[in-house]
Amino acid sequence: MNEQVIKKNITEMEEAVFLIDMNVGFCEKGALADPSIKEIVPNIIPIIREALMKGAGFFVVNDNHTKDSVELKRYAGHCMGDEESKTIKELAVYEEYADRTFYKNSTCALFAPGMMEMLMEMVSLKRVVLVGCCTDICIQNFAIALRNFFDELNMDVEIVVPKNAVETFHIPGVHDRKENNERAYTVMENTGVRLVKTMKEVA
């Protein structure tokens, strides 16, 4: 980045952007990859850059499984601690500026090692923005879990999901992209997550 990156202490951050599962195993190659997901990359980059320039938190979350992962009883083998678990190169250039990278063994980033402990330290936090994939799985699960987590702790934190910066996969006749995106939008909104077309709608 040519612009200056502002870094704040975790306790001072008022906003945090989480980049979810924009890794090789979901976006480029592997049993669960859908390369069309990368079409949201141009919409994600400005969100990351703005976060870095204004001192918001920036966190990367990627899948990272082992042969013993119970999740693999329901999904084909993917992101087994290899190249598939790495952030795609278009976004990896920003990962070096991330405050932290988390690796998860489930479809909900809240349970990634260290996540809850970190969130409880973020006493100034007012907004969380989620970008990445998949809208109806890891984005939805994290968004709803965060909503409940913050409510339980009486933390008044807005959770924002920009529709142009999240995506899911498409398998004709099995998993329709549009239908599953729309269903996830509704489920998230019904639990108190703010859905916006783009981050331009967010003051």
Feature-to-residue mapping (PLM):
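A short alpha/beta connector and helix-capping loop motif
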Residues: 13, 30-64
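Metal-dependent catalytic neighborhoods of phosphoester/phosphodiester hydrolases
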Residues: 69-74
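Short acidic, Gly/Ser-rich segments with clustered Asp/Glu that frequently serve as metal-coordination loops
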Residues: 22-30
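N-terminal nucleotide-binding beta1-loop-alpha1 segment
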Residues: 16-22
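Active-site-adjacent betaalpha module
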Residues: 1-16, 76-203
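Solvent-exposed loop/turn segments at secondary-structure junctions
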Residues: 65-67, 135
